[in-house]
């Protein structure tokens, strides 16, 4: 059976993008961004705190890290919950030891399930981000916008009592969006989102409710991707992050354009006892280059980038 | 199954004859080089809302697959110029495997490549429009349109072809040869160019395009560590360089800016190029230059050698 002729028609073939979400531009061609105190590299660390329900339905698709075994998949349920009980405290200790700050992207349901965890997260004073309801509630193409709106509002309402400042940013579970997610995030009063991994600096993102900023949070450099999906050694994870840091520092100095390293960390991955020292080696490297690195909350980084001029 | 409706799939594509590596006439590259090195950056466009194809899903997640789309878009927004910087440093010109729609979406990227005297060859229209399910007339239209776009926007004749997303039909190579192409990158059976059979009987050549050293295959499919990828490139070079003392070999490094140009990966590629380009006897070529040289100097000898091998077989 042959394809219809419209398979060779291209209604969105035009200059720029084939959608209207953002303008086309290349990183190297943009006006330079500069960070406070003349630092070369903005360092955004994000720690994702996630709840993977045992009765995963996989509506839309199953987010990575989900249940894979026949019900009840105690193996994956407990390995994920480990991050919220044990792993997070190793990660927080490592941050504290290196005088680093991170943002905390937290599934809303965790605030209902584990208020004791949220009180401890609150005590860090770190910026908190919405991270969806749980890891079995992905925002996928075709999701009913009424349900999606409810998930977003419920998530933000649940986290609000524990956030030091009003929540401005969002990371969708599995970085997945429906056709309406950007509009719904804007309508919920959020300023920025981290889902699109197509850039290394913040950029302007259009919604029907007004402009959102996109703060790309690297997928290919995150622990779950490198250690979990690619099965690379923990030591190799550290090498890769260190190589990225060194490259971006060099590129920033060479071009006199500020760069950003955005690193997502999962306590259920790097919080394991055999992995935490490799995360600490990464933090040691950041500390060794502290004269050139500006470690800040993502909303501060976004403000500084905006301050440099209109975003791409 | 990509056989036209009603046809029985073939057990052998019939595109090349068996030709053992130990019995071939010597290939002499320009300047007596041992290895013809060519770098093939894929400059691709993946669509936000591609039409469905019953034989292959363009994106794994329900549309919009924001993660898949953004992962590829990174190459165009961030990656190309990092890769170009490394290639400039070592005097390497790219042979661009081009989603022809990129000429229209992102002419700024094309200008950067054209200014460096890079070659452009066809990789279809979009990397989310597959050959699967196309009639022969439709596939011909797609191939010819991609070649016409390349000529219109760059002034170059499109000499090479790599089917979009490596999606093929039984007629792909035939159609490209008939449309005026000189070489295909779609066959991975050799480390030297080889003649390829096409139904028109044109002088047509397969130029090695290594899938094993393709960054997307190594990083995405084989999940290789960045530093190991750099080492794999060096190891492949060492062997092809050694063998190239006796007869010229081809080394291709196919790249995708959305893979190789990540901050944790670009250094491994740079190290490998630094190592390779520190050797004398490396012909920094393009796909077109390799194909033309081979057609002019080695093709006829190759046909004779292949025929002689066939005669070894009992009748």
What is each of the regions a protein language model found here?
Chain A
Residues 2-213, 239-263, 269-312:
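Catalytic alpha-helical scaffold of carbohydrate-active enzymes acting on polysaccharides/glycoconjugates
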């Amino acid at each position: 059976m042959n394809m219809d002729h419209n398979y060779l028609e291209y209604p969105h073939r035009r200059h720029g993008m084939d959608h209207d979400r953002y303008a086309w531009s290349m990183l190297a061609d943009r006006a330079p961004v500069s960070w406070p105190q003349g630092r070369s590299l903005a360092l955004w660390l994000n720690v994702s705190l996630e709840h993977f329900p045992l009765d995963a339905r996989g509506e839309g698709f199953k987010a990575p890290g989900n249940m894979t075994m026949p019900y009840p998949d105690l193996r994956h349920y407990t390995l994920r919950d480990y991050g919220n009980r044990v792993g997070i405290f190793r990660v927080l200790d490592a941050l504290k030891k290196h005088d680093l700050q991170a943002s905390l992207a937290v599934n809303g349901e965790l605030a209902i399930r584990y208020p004791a965890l949220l009180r401890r997260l609150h005590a860090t004073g770190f910026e908190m981000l919405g991270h969806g309801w749980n890891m079995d509630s992905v925002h996928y193409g075709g999701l009913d916008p009424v349900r999606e709106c409810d998930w977003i509002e419920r998530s933000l309402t649940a986290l609000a009592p524990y956030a030091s400042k009003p929540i401005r940013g969002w990371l969708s579970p599995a970085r997945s969006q429906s056709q309406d997610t950007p509009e719904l995030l804007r309508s919920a009063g959020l300023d920025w989102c981290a889902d699109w991994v197509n850039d290394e600096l913040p950029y302007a993102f259009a919604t029907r409710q007004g402009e959102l900023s996109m703060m790309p949070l690297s997928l290919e450099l995150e622990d779950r991707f490198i250690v979990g999906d690619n099965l690379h050694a923990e030591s190799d994870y550290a090498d890769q992050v260190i190589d990225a840091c060194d490259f971006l520092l060099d590129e920033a100095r060479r071009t006199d354009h500020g760069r950003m390293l955005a690193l997502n960390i999962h306590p259920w991955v790097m919080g394991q006892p055999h992995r935490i020292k490799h995360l600490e080696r990464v933090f040691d490297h950041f500390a060794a280059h502290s004269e050139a690195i500006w470690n800040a909350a993502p909303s501060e980084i976004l403000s500084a980038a905006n301050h440099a001029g209109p975003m791409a | 199954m990509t056989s036209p409706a009603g046809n029985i799939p073939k057990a052998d594509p019939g595109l090349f004859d068996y030709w053992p590596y130990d019995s071939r006439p010597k290939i002499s590259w320009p300047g007596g080089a041992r290895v013809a090195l060519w770098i093939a950056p894929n400059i691709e466009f993946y669509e936000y809302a591609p039409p469905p194809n019953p034989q292959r899903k363009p994106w794994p997640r329900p549309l919009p697959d924001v993660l898949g789309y953004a992962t590829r878009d990174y190459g165009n927004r961030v990656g190309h110029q990092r890769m170009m910087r490394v290639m400039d440093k070592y005097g390497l010109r790219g042979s661009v495997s081009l989603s022809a729609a990129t000429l229209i979406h992102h002419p700024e990227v094309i200008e950067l490549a054209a200014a460096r005297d890079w070659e452009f060859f066809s990789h279809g229209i979009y990397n989310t429009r597959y050959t699967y399910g196309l009639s022969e007339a439709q596939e011909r239209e797609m191939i010819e349109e991609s070649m016409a776009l390349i000529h219109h926007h760059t002034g170059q004749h499109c000499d090479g072809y790599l089917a979009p997303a490596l999606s093929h039909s039984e007629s792909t190579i035939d159609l490209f040869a008939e449309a005026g192409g000189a070489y295909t990158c779609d066959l991975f059976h050799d480390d030297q160019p080889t003649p390829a059979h096409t139904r028109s009987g044109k002088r047509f050549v397969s130029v090695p395009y290594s899938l094993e050293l393709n960054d997307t295959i190594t990083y995405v499919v084989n999940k290789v560590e960045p530093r190991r990828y750099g080492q794999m490139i060096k190891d492949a070079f060492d062997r092809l360089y050694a063998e190239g003392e006796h007869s010229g070999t081809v080394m291709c490094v196919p790249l995708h800016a959305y893979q190789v140009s990540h901050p944790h990966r670009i250094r491994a590629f740079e190290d490998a190029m630094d190592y390779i380009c520190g050797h004398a006897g490396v012909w920094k070529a393009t796909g077109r230059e390799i194909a033309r040289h081979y057609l002019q100097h080695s093709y006829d000898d190759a046909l004779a050698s292949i025929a002689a091998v066939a005669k070894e077989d009992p009748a």
